[in-house]
Amino acid sequence: MKKIEKTLDEWRSMLDPEQYQVCRLKGTERPFSGKYNSERRDGIYHCICCNLPLFDAQTKFDSGCGWPSFYAPIEDSAMIEIRDTSHGMIRTEVTCARCDAHLGHVFPDGPAPTGLRYCINSVCIDLRPRD
């Protein structure tokens, strides 16, 4: 996959302040505040920064954690997993494989068939109808 590389100033000019804070500076939106937390429409969730398809809405589930949760990415190659030891915790950060946008974290407490919970910030994704 061809990487998209931009300066922080370029990202800042194309994203709104919250998207920039979360996607480029590894922030986190407040729990239960994101527009996709309770979303039930069908479609494909894309990276807000580069439009890469990330998650199929059919893999979304209600985890009760306050952020949209999915049990699998649309393709394993769409994500990069990075060990995250910030805030006194050991977690696995997930970023977009194309543009390195911070998306959220993945945890080993999800439903079958994967047992994974991709906990994703709503500001990092865009739900679009299937083609």
Swiss-Prot record:
The gene is msrB. Binds 1 zinc ion per subunit. The zinc ion is important for the structural integrity of the protein. Pfam families: SelR. The active site is at C119 (nucleophile). It comes from Pseudomonas putida (strain GB-1). It catalyses: L-methionyl-[protein] + [thioredoxin]-disulfide + H2O = L-methionyl-(R)-S-oxide-[protein] + [thioredoxin]-dithiol. Gene3D superfamilies: Peptide methionine sulfoxide reductase. Its cofactor is Zn(2+). This is Peptide methionine sulfoxide reductase MsrB. GO terms for molecular function: peptide-methionine (R)-S-oxide reductase activity; zinc ion binding. NCBIfam families: peptide-methionine (R)-S-oxide reductase MsrB. Belongs to the MsrB Met sulfoxide reductase family. SUPFAM superfamilies: Mss4-like. Zn(2+) binds at C47, C50, C96, C99. Signal peptide: none annotated.
